[in-house]
């Protein structure tokens, strides 16, 4: 037993010294045990099962090491129902599969090229990759972003980020960020047509006569349009709004012994934000919101949900219900309002008319292209 422990310790130390830890075919994780993830060499990133709301999901996250909450970076099959506590994840020749006691095996991460998987790694870049027997990457999570990109990751032309439904539900939410073929970076409500009338923010990065461009968040937290052919920087994208915690981040950054990981996320509220995650020497990390696309969140179409309106005071958005309605959930004011009275029908066009009235509200700006129901 002592020899086995020593060998495991030796493997762990060698893994940390390398740029990746190789996960062999047949390796598995179980949600019912303490081994629920595979970590990167630095242990800053992990891939495996994570808890969210009332279920389990498979994804990649920044590991808070028990000192801070984990920051989820990517979720696999985000719109599928969550797994139960008896799920098992395994790497085999077709990729990563997940099985449970209540359903048959399913392919969770497939190889688009139908190449045979041979091994996998959770890299220190935050990229989970699958290799073939020639050690070539045949699948990587960086090519399938959900709502976040990391420093060193790119968003290709006509690709998108989609916000999560809520902080406790990683399924697709209400907004998406598109890297359009014309080079522009644009925010739209997800359930509307992508057109100039429905867009609520754009980076003004139109490009003419230049193809093969991608949006890249570099390792120092700068968003850039990159030429995919020669990796040259075509244009830098600036998020104009400086967040309140920006000055705190600058103070923290002055300590050179701390390492920083940058991320850019389309958050639940529809705003696109740049974050810095500063790792502490004793483990864990501190997250700072640095910049965002919009100063006024009320400009985000549908920010307050159905039957409600948004006001912006003291640099903060506030949602309020239209007369005759109350919040669907008082603890989540952004999901909208519902009628607070019993419906009365106007039979023959006359009955119950006294129960209805039309009320005018002053100072309301109707947002073109988004219809309340």
How would you name each of these model-derived features?
Residues 2-373:
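Beta-rich ligand-binding surfaces for carbohydrates and other polyanions
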């Amino acid at each position: 037993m002592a020899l086995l422990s020593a060998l495991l310790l030796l493997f762990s130390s060698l893994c940390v010294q390398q740029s990746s830890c190789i996960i062999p075919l047949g390796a598995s994780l179980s949600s019912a045990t303490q081994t629920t993830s595979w970590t990167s060499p630095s242990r800053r990133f992990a891939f495996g099962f994570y808890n969210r709301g009332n279920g389990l999901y498979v994804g990649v996250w920044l590991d808070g090491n028990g000192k801070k909450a984990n920051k989820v970076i990517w979720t696999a099959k985000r719109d599928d129902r969550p797994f139960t506590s008896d799920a098992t994840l395994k790497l085999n020749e077709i990729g990563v599969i997940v099985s449970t006691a209540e359903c048959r095996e399913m392919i969770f991460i497939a190889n688009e090229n139908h190449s045979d998987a041979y091994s996998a790694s959770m890299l220190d870049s935050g990229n989970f990759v699958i290799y073939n027997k020639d050690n070539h990457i045949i699948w990587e999570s960086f090519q399938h972003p959900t709502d976040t990109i990391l420093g060193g990751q790119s968003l290709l032309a006509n690709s998108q980020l989609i916000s999560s439904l809520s902080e406790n539900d990683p399924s697709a939410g209400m907004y998406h960020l598109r890297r359009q073929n014309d080079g522009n970076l644009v925010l739209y409500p997800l359930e509307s047509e992508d057109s100039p009338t429905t867009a609520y923010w754009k980076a003004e990065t139109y490009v003419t006569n230049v193809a093969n461009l991608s949006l890249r968040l570099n390792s120092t937290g700068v968003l850039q349009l990159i030429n995919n052919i020669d990796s040259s920087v075509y244009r830098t994208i600036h998020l104009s709004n400086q967040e309140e915690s920006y000055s705190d981040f600058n103070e923290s950054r002055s300590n050179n012994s701390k390492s920083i990981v940058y991320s850019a996320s389309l958050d639940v509220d529809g705003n696109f934000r740049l974050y810095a995650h500063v790792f502490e020497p004793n483990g864990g990390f501190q997250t700072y919101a640095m910049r965002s696309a919009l100063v006024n969140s009320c400009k985000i179409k549908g920010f307050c949900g159905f039957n409600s309106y948004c006001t912006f005071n003291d640099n903060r958005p506030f949602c309020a219900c239209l007369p005759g309605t109350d919040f669907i959930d008082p603890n989540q004011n952004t999901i909208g309002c519902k009628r607070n009275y019993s419906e009365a029908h106007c039979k023959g066009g006359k009955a119950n008319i006294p129960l209805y009235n039309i009320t005018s509200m002053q100072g309301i700006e109707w947002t073109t292209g988004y219809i309340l129901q």
